Design a protein with these regions (language model features):
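Cap/lid segment of the alpha/beta-hydrolase catalytic domain
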Residues: 88-97, 106-147
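N-terminal cap/lid segment of alpha/beta-hydrolase-fold proteins
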Residues: 24-79, 106, 119, 145
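Boundary at the C-terminal end of the N-terminal hydrophobic targeting segment
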Residues: 13-17
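Short beta-strand element of the alpha/beta-hydrolase
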Residues: 70, 81-91
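Short, glycine/acidic-rich beta->alpha junctions
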Residues: 65-66, 97-101
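Short amphipathic alpha-helical segments and helix-helix/interface helices
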Residues: 20-21, 102-106
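Sec-dependent signal peptide recognition
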Residues: 1-7
């Protein structure tokens, strides 16, 4: 049994590189982040970051090429691990940072005693495609890109 587990682990370690692996590993000069400040959070420390994650498409293909996000890092008073839970959420790019930590996520951080990170504004929206007559959000963005 141990030999089988070792063989499976070895094979997974040498799995072929995919297009997604190459995309994620490719440096993007747009990537940056900076702390914005602390926000209220019961029995936790919550910090908001302003993060630019990537450049997506070219300016002639879409109205917003640079993806900007609000990231909230919630750290409970007592932690048992530095490994964090990551929650990816939606929202629109309206320019205002979060004013307080999400109560549910703060509760998870306290109960699990681990940091919790919320990455907002995925996908970045609204966006407009050339020749389109309206701004698109969420599934409408996905549907448009399938054409």
């Amino acid at each position: 049994m141990r030999i089988l587990l070792f063989a499976a682990a070895a094979l997974s370690a040498v799995a072929a590189e995919t297009a997604l692996d190459r995309y994620i590993a490719k440096p993007d000069p747009a990537f940056t982040w900076k702390p914005v400040g602390a926000i209220p959070c019961q029995k936790c420390t919550a910090t908001v970051l302003d993060m630019t994650s990537q450049t997506w498409r070219k300016p002639e293909e879409i109205s917003r090429t640079t993806w900007q996000h609000w990231v909230t890092v919630i750290r409970p008073e007592k932690t048992v691990s530095d490994i964090a839970l990551l929650f990816i959420s939606g929202g629109a790019n309206n320019g205002r940072p979060p004013q307080r930590a999400d109560d549910m996520l703060a509760g998870i951080a306290r109960e699990c005693q681990v940091p919790v990170i919320e990455l907002r504004m995925v996908p970045n929206q609204p966006v407009r495609f050339p020749g389109d007559t309206r701004d698109r959000t969420e599934d409408s963005i996905i549907a448009y890109t399938w054409d």
